[in-house]
Amino acid sequence: MANVTLRNVRKTYTGGFEAIKGVNVDVADGQFCVLVGPSGCGKSTLLRMVAGLETVTGGEIDIGGRVVNQIEPADRDIAMVFQNYALYPHMSVYNNMAYGLRNRGMAEAEIKTRVEEAARVLELTSMLERKPRQLSGGQRQRVAMGRAIVRQPKVFLFDEPLSNLDAKLRIAMRVEIRKLQRRLNTTSIYVTHDQLEAMTLADVLVVMNGGQVEQVGNPLAIYEKPATTFVASFIGAPPMNLMSTRSDEIKSQLGGSAAEAGVLGIRPEDFVITDQTPAGGVALPLTVEAIERVGAETFVYGSREQEDQRVAATPGELPPGEVIVRIPGTEAPTIGARIRVAAIRPKLHLFSGDGRTRLEA
């Protein structure tokens, strides 16, 4: 096991495109760190730099107290699991898991011990003689993880390993990966674009955007106190409602310095349908445009009567003038109904006009 430290890490490609812009991240020994962000944000590039598959233009990557910038991937004592299982189709499960160890010249008795132990942990013992074509997608992914486990590395690297699986299997494998990491207690860095996957897996969450780190911290802390409007709209499904504080409707309710903040954010679950306006809070009249019933809860999509200026759109952000409200159960107003929703002061999130700074509500 080992800690991983990224110090002002940069990656610039030929032509001057800067994919990674001075990233600083500390992953403690035994932690599960998740890099999350939209496509093109640089998360997979950063992971490949840790693995040694991409060169480092600037800064340092430290694994277990050793700067590895100039060290070959095979000598970094890491193991990587990819989106593509990359199993040898003509080999059995056992031989797929043993292949890397044999290439390193390990004794066959030690290989057998490691493969059988990994198979036991991953519940693959009964499948060791099967070929990959005889396995389901989830079983193939477990074999790929087993191939990484038998190396007993200091660090596991996961590059969107669940992307090829269907929704039900993704959930099951997500749970299995977390249980496995806790059992092995091996430092792990995991890349995903799925914020739900990120929230449920991570000890420490790194939210990336445009080659930079937007926020680092405990997943729940990031959800409850996003540092920027990008984080607010990316982390959480449905996304946070964001609106200008400078519209007369909101400005008059916030009052004081809060009214000059620039951007107001409210999570869908923090609204209630009510005729009352809470002291210090915000109430909005809406026209119901759509209803989504998903079982235990219902999403109400409404349009505001007066549209306002908004911050620049970010991935997952709601269209201008639209507000989404999450309510428990299946009871909901009818489409076309006029309703009033409100949120109390402690549930309000305020940001600067450019969306880059969180302010006190």
UniProtKB/Swiss-Prot annotation:
UniProt-listed GO biological process terms: carbohydrate transport; glycerol-3-phosphate transmembrane transport; glycerophosphodiester transmembrane transport
Record keywords, A-Z: ATP-binding, Cell inner membrane, Cell membrane, Membrane, Nucleotide-binding, Sugar transport, Translocase, Transport
Record-linked InterPro entries: AAA+_ATPase, ABC_transporter-like_ATP-bd, ABC_transporter-like_CS, ABC_transpr_MalK-like, ABC_transpr_MalK/UgpC-like, Mo/tungstate-bd_C_term_dom, P-loop_NTPase
Catalytic activity: sn-glycerol 3-phosphate(out) + ATP + H2O = sn-glycerol 3-phosphate(in) + ADP + phosphate + H(+)
Annotated compartments: Cell inner membrane
Pfam families per the UniProt record, alphabetical: ABC_tran (PF00005)
Sequence ranges assigned to domain ABC transporter in this UniProt record: 4-235
A GO CC term attached to the entry: ATP-binding cassette (ABC) transporter complex, substrate-binding subunit-containing
GO molecular function: ABC-type glycerol-3-phosphate transporter activity; ATP binding; ATP hydrolysis activity
EC nos: 7.6.2.10
Source organism superkingdom: Bacteria
Enzyme category, top tier: translocase
Membrane topology: Peripheral membrane protein
Binding site for ATP: G37, P38, S39, G40, C41, G42, K43, S44
Family, as annotated: Belongs to the ABC transporter superfamily. sn-glycerol-3-phosphate importer (TC 3.A.1.1.3) family.
Function of the protein: Part of the ABC transporter complex UgpBAEC involved in sn-glycerol-3-phosphate (G3P) import. Responsible for energy coupling to the transport system.
Subunit structure: The complex is composed of two ATP-binding proteins (UgpC), two transmembrane proteins (UgpA and UgpE) and a solute-binding protein (UgpB).
Protein's name in the database: sn-glycerol-3-phosphate import ATP-binding protein UgpC
UniProt source species: Bradyrhizobium diazoefficiens (strain JCM 10833 / BCRC 13528 / IAM 13628 / NBRC 14792 / USDA 110)
Top-level taxonomy: Bacteria, Pseudomonadati, Pseudomonadota, Alphaproteobacteria, Hyphomicrobiales
Gene that this sequence comes from: ugpC
